[in-house]
C-alpha cells in the first residue's frame, strides 16, 4: 500500500506498555527493512485495544482518512469502530497464512465486538491521550529508541 502510493504515511499501533515488550518498534523495523523512510512511520505506543488505537488515530494523530491493515477476522470490527468515530475508513486483510487457534480468536472476537459496540455508543477516552502528533508531520517524533 505504501509503495503503491495508497498511504503516504504509516501509523503503527500496538502495546508498548512494558519496557521489554514493544509491538510498535517491531512494526517500524519491519517497515524500515522494506525501505519505508523513517519519517513516514509513526508509532502509537498506547494502542492497547482496537478502540483505543482508532480513537488515538483520530484525536492524537489527527487522521481523517485511514486504511486499516489487520487480520480479516478483526478487520470488520476495526472498520466499524473507525466509522463510528467519524473516520473515513477502508480495510485490507493482512492474512498471509492460516493461523493455528483461529477458533479461539473467533470466540474472543464475538465478545470484543459486544464490548466495542458499547464503547462506540458511550465513546470513553482511551487510557492515554496527550498532545497532538499530526500524521501529516514527521514520524520520527514518535521514536523512543
PLM features: what roles do these ranges have?
Residues 106-129:
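A transmembrane-helix-recognition feature enriched in membrane-embedded lipid enzymes
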Residues 124-145:
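Short linear elements at protein peripheries
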